[in-house]
Amino acid sequence: MIKYSVILILVLTNIFGKEGYFINPIISGAHPDPSICRVGDDFYIVNSSFEYFPGLPIHHSKDLVNWELIGYGLHREDQCNGKMNLVDVQSDGGIHAPTIRYHKGTFYIITTNVYNSGDGSPGLMRNFIITAKNPSGPWSKPYIIEGAPGIDPDIFFDDNGKVYFTGTHSPGDMNANGIGEIWIQEIDIKKWKLIGNRHTVWDGIFGCCTEGPHIYKEHGLYYLLVAEGGTGKNHAVMIAASEDILGPYEENQRNPILTTRHLSNEYFVNSTGHADMIELEDGRWYMVSLGKRNDLDGDANMGRETYLMPMQWEPTIVKWEQVSEDRWEPLRYLFPVVAPLTGKVERFTPLPYADKPQYINNTVVDDFLDENLDLRWTFVRVPEEKTYSLSENPGFLRLYSKPGIIQDRKRFSLVGFRQKESDFEFEVKINFSPEKDKVESGIIHYQKEWNYLTNTVTKVKKKYYLEQNLKEKSKEIVTLKKTILKGYDGNIILKVKSKKDKYDFYYSLNKGSSFIYFTSMDAIKTVSYTHLTLPTIY
């Protein structure tokens, strides 16, 4: 077993906003499908995490613009190695679209584990709930909700004591996994079972990819918020209202209430959708949604991120009702108007709290002296028991090499963090002296098993080489550059400088006194169309 040690230094661009304004996104670097709740003056957001572990990242804020990662809903292997599987889950599977809510002293997260066994059998969409008294954890084991099809579930606590599960199903069949229509059913949260009848309540406005439902009760009405149009550039947020939670729901005639589908790639963000709403203590309202930056011809290596917009409620005519033989009167419901002055997500928006400015500090320096790995580090799937150590060589993260190559459904010695900006510097000090040939260690810009860029040190016949390899979808791995490391003594510093659309790579063999330029690469080679890019140690 080959062992190697690393120290990380990462400097991302620190961003300062205009006085009195905050900058979107509020949570950068692959934090899609945000759901938000408030307890007093504390706000909490949870996001999708797909096949990555720990899963379900939870952020905390006092002001809606400065967010701190405080923990994960899925943070133990025993939560993820049964019916809820993050051990050998396929790429793009795993945890989809959670909802976080607080009720009578307990936090609830409800979400879906999408799992495909790979043997040709139908894929599974297992909806489950976890609970905690403290949002930073520990969180409970997953409670699987049997017989609940679809993805993106919501849990709603009505003021009459009933609790409702809201989910999706394929059009025309309320027992079929998929998206397109929204269903509601009462749930017993003591037994974790659905009870009563199931009701299909809405298929959205245009009937395309209706998903991501959330239920609210305001102004004497039940509101059903959904995402529609797919998670690409036609993404949008729609809303409907009803006097009964089971419907019928009246569509807001001003839908969509949020979208960027009408904006060009010259705007800073696209694909906004999959939203949640929150009321502040003073009665004001805000919305969070996902969005994707337009850094690379409509895409970005940060994937889908979390954005914040103000909103307000305004009366809207939903239909005309006949009140007498010759008289009709309008029926008006209050509906949200998002970003009331512009109707779109803004890069700069007035602060929710004028006395609480935003400061984004993206600098990370990890000397690995703590007993536990920093919360920002992420694995692809649940790591095997002997993947890393912080105690074997204090002050270093020791990774243990594993046989084979990076491939779908496998677990490998790779740990990284979410790329948060297009402009950054990433530096890793590596101690690597393998006994065997063709063992490699270095850094990876990892998008998926089928799309990544490696810069690694490799030993071949007592000589050490630095080489760059690119894996693109549907293509074989290609070596782009290879150079012999003259004078290599087992220690090297690898550095990446990123500037929007290009990565420049450097290395140092003299403890950082000077760096040698290695090569460059267009960032679009590992562009994250939907999920994330992980600058990683490998």
Predicted segments with their positions:
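Blade-edge beta-strand/turn elements of extracellular beta-propeller
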Residues: 19-26, 67-76, 81-88, 130-148, ...
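Hydrophobic core segments of beta-strands in well-ordered, beta-rich domains
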Residues: 37-52, 59, 96-119, 141-145, ...
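Secretory/extracellular carbohydrate-interaction modules
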Residues: 406-462
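Single conserved hydrophobic/aromatic residue that forms the stacking wall/gate
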Residues: 531-538
